[in-house]
């Protein structure tokens, strides 16, 4: 349940306005864990011109141990794809607990 950051390096051959950046996270068995993009998050309009990078900082990654893959997308607000990378990278999550399921819920036991 540690902070997690995704950095996407890009090189735009020409200036692109109103670019939406998106990610999707899948477990190794292709269970869809999470997805978001800058349009969903009401981010400001993004313009790409030349080279740079985009950082997505995730404050908590409360998934259980396992292998996960991340899809990356750059598209217009109307859905026209500039670029899409299926399984652009993979991540191994390790936990000290042996919980089961998809996520690790923050919890306390209170036995009286």
Indicate where each model-derived feature is located.
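Localized sequence-composition bias
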Residues: 1-112
């Amino acid at each position: 349940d540690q902070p997690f950051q995704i950095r996407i390096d890009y090189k735009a051959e020409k200036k692109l306005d109103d670019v939406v950046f998106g990610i999707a996270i899948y477990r190794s068995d292709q269970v869809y864990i999470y997805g978001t993009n800058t349009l969903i998050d009401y981010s400001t309009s993004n313009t790409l011109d030349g080279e740079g990078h985009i950082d997505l900082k995730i404050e908590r990654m409360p998934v259980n141990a396992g292998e996960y893959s991340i899809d990356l997308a750059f598209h217009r607000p109307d859905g026209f794809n500039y670029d899409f990378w299926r399984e652009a990278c993979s991540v191994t999550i390790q936990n000290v607990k042996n919980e089961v399921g998809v996520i690790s819920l923050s919890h306390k036991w209170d036995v009286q």
